[in-house]
């Protein structure tokens, strides 16, 4: 007789065990558990809701077949055309830093494979996810549909200046780095809205949180330093998202 292993790892930091007192976990769940314990918790991601989310949203379903062996590794994963998934610990840190709420209307710029969008959508009311490449719009939508997320609007378009059509937003998340943040994007936030972007150029980039404290005032906080691929590819003095 087998007893299914049912657990909620991080609500109270307790583990639940099978009838014989031994923890039963398949290899994928073991890798996921190790990712959370060894990479993510040690990088100052301690919010129980975020940690539970990382267990519930199956990262491996957003990883290309040829990279399944490193789906939970502390590394960026190539997708297509110089675009990659961010490392698990960075994705988790970004989500935690936005302090997302169930009522939030959120913009994600850079759909990629859809994983960061899926994490966001699992915590909020609805998400608009924008990517200039129709390949990623289709891929992200398919991946999110597989796990039955239905509160996401996927759009193909240039998100370099945000996305005016569905503004204002309670939160805006850029899934890659920007050399500079256009000032106009801030105005797409609601009052008390948060914007998180990694700003700068290698080797010096900073994860920066901007909060709209009033109609005319914004607060800016540098959270940490990192280096990630840019959302922009430069061609003949223009930036293409």
How should these model regions be labeled?
Residues 6-7, 62, 126, 159:
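Alpha-helical interaction segments
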Residues 2, 16-19, 155, 160:
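Intrinsically disordered, low-complexity segments enriched in small/polar residues
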Residues 208-213, 220-241:
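Substrate-binding/catalytic lobe of Class I Rossmann-like enzymes that use SAM or dcSAM, i.e.
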Residues 23-107, 119, 123, 138, ...:
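Class I SAM-dependent transferase core
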Residues 1-3, 99:
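Short intrinsically disordered, low-complexity coil segments enriched in acidic
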Residues 99-219:
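Conserved nucleotide-cofactor-binding alpha/beta core module
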């Amino acid at each position: 007789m087998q007893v299914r292993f049912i657990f909620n790892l991080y609500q109270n930091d307790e583990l639940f065990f099978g009838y014989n007192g031994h923890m039963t976990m398949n290899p994928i769940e073991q890798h996921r558990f190790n990712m959370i314990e060894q990479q993510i918790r040690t990088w100052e991601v301690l919010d129980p809701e975020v940690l539970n989310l990382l267990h519930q949203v199956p990262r491996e379903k957003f990883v290309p077949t040829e990279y399944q062996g490193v789906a939970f590794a502390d590394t960026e994963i190539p997708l297509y055309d110089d675009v990659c998934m961010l490392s698990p610990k960075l994705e988790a840190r970004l989500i935690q830093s936005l302090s997302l709420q169930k009522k939030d209307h959120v913009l994600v710029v850079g759909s990629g494979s859809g994983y960061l969008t899926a994490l966001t959508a699992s915590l909020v009311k609805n998400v608009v996810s924008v990517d200039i490449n129709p390949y990623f719009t289709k891929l992200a939508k398919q991946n999110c549909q597989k796990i039955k997320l239905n509160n996401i609007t996927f759009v193909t378009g240039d998100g370099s200046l945000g996305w005016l059509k569905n503004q204002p937003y309670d939160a805006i998340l850029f899934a890659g780095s920007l050399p500079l943040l256009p000032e106009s994007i801030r105005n797409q936030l609601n009052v008390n809205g948060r914007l998180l972007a990694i700003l700068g150029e290698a080797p010096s980039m900073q994860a920066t949180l901007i909060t709209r404290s009033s109609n005319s005032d914004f607060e800016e906080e540098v959270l940490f330093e990192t280096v990630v691929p840019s959302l922009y590819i430069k061609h003949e003095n223009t930036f293409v998202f």
